[in-house]
Design a protein with these regions (language model features):
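N-terminal helix-turn-helix DNA-binding module of bacterial transcription factors
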Residues: 1-60
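Amphipathic helical "hinge" segments at domain boundaries
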Residues: 46-113
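Short beta-strand elements in bilobed, periplasmic/extracellular small-molecule ligand-binding domains
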Residues: 91-105, 204-227
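Flexible loop/hinge segments that line or gate small-molecule binding clefts
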Residues: 127-169, 252, 278-290
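Hydrophobic alpha-helical segments within soluble ligand-binding/sensing domains
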Residues: 160-187, 197, 226-234, 293-313
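An alpha-beta-alpha
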Residues: 171-212, 320-333
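Short acidic capping loops at alpha-helix termini that bridge into adjacent secondary structure
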Residues: 184, 214-218, 268-274
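Flexible loop/turn connectors
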Residues: 230-337
Length: 337
């Protein structure tokens, strides 16, 4: 492969001039010479040495994407289409910036910090973090960071987060069920923190506004056990006759529960209406198709990457908190009573 030195010799110019064109510093080179260098690059199919460029700029060219997932939630967190869609979109937008994405998933924040620190990343995107995780990251990591879907209350540090209006989504899907004639509505989630807590609070807001009673038994805490979904499905089945509608905190759980209840002989939505949250592929694959809350994961990923690179480049990144809108997608899983 041709070198910068050889190109400079062929063009009768300096290696600095050729290097400036290759690295986009064309303002320091005459237009005629810029065209000559570009023509030579194309002729010899020259590919810049990324390692040398990163060394010169004191950057690694790596963006870390770290996800914290409960060890008993999934045997593989990426199986959830929400996670897969976000990872794919982040990687695509990071790659468009000329960077690489390194992914790390763990239930241990200490392990995440230790591993990510060894990568010498230029910036970090963080998902699934709770308040104490954010505080530890702020103490230990001195890299540009953008959180996704974080809700840190009463913290002493500034942080940047991109999310959606989870509480509004929980409220609107509950109002939709109430307007459809439902009053006995359960909320199902595997935790009551972060985004699931916000969605749950939206559910409670809607019940309160409608004058409907609520008690703790209406919150069905799903208890996953890795790859084994049988416990969750049994939990849902045992409570299904107590309600006319289930609100699941994610399409992932809603799809599993819907299919299992049908397999056990329940008619959906005639005997039980089921709705989800996310509007991912799960909502469209099951029958009846899920009514759900839509969020634009691709746009969330794009904004996250843009903010991170603005921070890396010491540019204005806008507001610390970016909240994307949500809306109801009506399909076939809700009975009008």
């Amino acid at each position: 492969m041709i070198t910068i030195k050889k190109m400079a010799e062929l063009l009768g110019t300096s290696t600095t001039t050729v290097s400036n064109v290759i690295h986009g510093k064309e303002g320091e080179v005459s237009p005629v010479m810029v065209e000559k260098v570009k023509k030579l690059i194309e002729e010899y199919d020259y590919v810049p040495n990324r390692n040398a460029r990163n060394l010169a700029s004191n950057r690694s060219g790596i963006i870390g994407l770290a996800m914290k997932a409960s060890e008993n939630k999934y045997d593989n967190f990426v199986k959830d289409p929400f996670a897969g869609e976000l990872i794919g979109a982040v990687e695509r937008y990071v790659r468009a910036k000329g960077y690489f994405t390194m992914l790390y998933v763990s239930s241990d924040i200490g392990e995440i910090i230790s591993s990510v620190s060894s990568w010498n990343v230029d910036g970090l995107i963080l998902l699934g973090m709770q308040k104490e995780d954010g505080e530890l990251l702020n103490q230990k990591m001195k890299k540009p960071m953008v959180f996704v879907d974080a809700y840190f209350e009463d913290v002493s540090f500034d942080y940047v987060n991109v999310g959606i209006d989870d509480r509004k989504g929980g409220r609107e899907i509950t109002e939709y069920l109430i307007q459809s004639g439902h009053q006995k509505i359960a909320f199902l989630a595997d935790n009551c923190m972060g985004v699931d807590y916000q969605r749950f609070m939206g559910y409670r807001d809607a019940l309160t506004s409608a004058g409907l009673p609520w008690n703790e038994e209406n919150f069905i805490r799903l208890r996953p056990s890795g790859a084994d979904m049988s416990l969750i499905l049994s939990q849902a089945y045992d409570r299904a006759r107590d309600f006319t509608a289930f609100i699941c905190a994610s399409d992932y759980y809603a799809a599993f529960i819907l299919n299992d209840l049908k397999d056990r002989g329940m008619k959906i939505p005639e005997e039980l209406s089921i709705v989800g949250f996310d509007d991912n592929v799960c909502s469209r694959l099951v029958r009846p198709a899920l009514t759900t809350v839509h969020q634009d994961v691709t746009e969330k990923s794009r904004i996250t990457v843009e903010k991170l690179f603005h921070i890396i480049n010491d540019e204005d990144y806008g507001a610390n908190f970016e909240q994307l809108p949500v809306f109801i997608v009506e399909r076939s899983s809700v009975r009008k009573m």
